[in-house]
Curated annotation (Swiss-Prot):
Isomerase recorded as keyword: no
Keywords, alphabetical: Endoplasmic reticulum, Glycoprotein, Golgi apparatus, Signal
Signal peptide coordinates: 1-23
UniProt-annotated glycosylation sites, renumbered to this chain: 121
Functional description taken from the UniProt entry: Has a role in meiosis.
Organism of this sequence: Schizosaccharomyces pombe (strain 972 / ATCC 24843)
Cellular component, GO annotation: cytoplasm; endoplasmic reticulum; Golgi apparatus
Cell compartment(s), UniProt: Endoplasmic reticulum; Golgi apparatus
Gene: mug121
Protein name as catalogued: Meiotically up-regulated gene 121 protein
Amino acid sequence: MKGFVVISRFILTLFILITPGLAGVVNYAENSEWNVPKYGNVLDSNCQGQKPVTFFGSVTEHVSNSWWIKLYDYMMTFISGEKLCMQNVAYEFEDISLCMDVVGSKCIPTLQSTDIEKVVNSTSAYLENSESDLTLGCFQIQRFQEESTLYIRALKSSEPVSCDTVRCIHFNHIPYV
């Protein structure tokens, strides 16, 4: 009987010690879209393993139906069915929070910089306002190069845009031109 009491106390102590840690894990999982590090990995089982996620960017212009997203020497990793968020990642520009939902059915291998234009110009994605959680609809992603700066424009189409052209796009390190 005494042994049973000792074991019970031991199990209770373990439970008390472990529970806060488990709560932290659950909390992180629930809010993981806001805690994606600037440097890190997101598991993508559809595209063979972990892919680097590095966010450098800012919204430089906002008009009624489009955003100009200024990206630096790293691009975002888009994973179908996942929501990847950039939060407070701007440098000399205004801090932003931007979410992208990527949908589709085809996985494109890691791209070289010479392949970006033709792929991005045929890529659709969802843009979402992270603060109001308002889905803005299907956007056509367009690429624009100006000297050493790469811009991607997400322009809301007046016509329905097919959002199943790609499953995922991985933009690895893009050297400055």
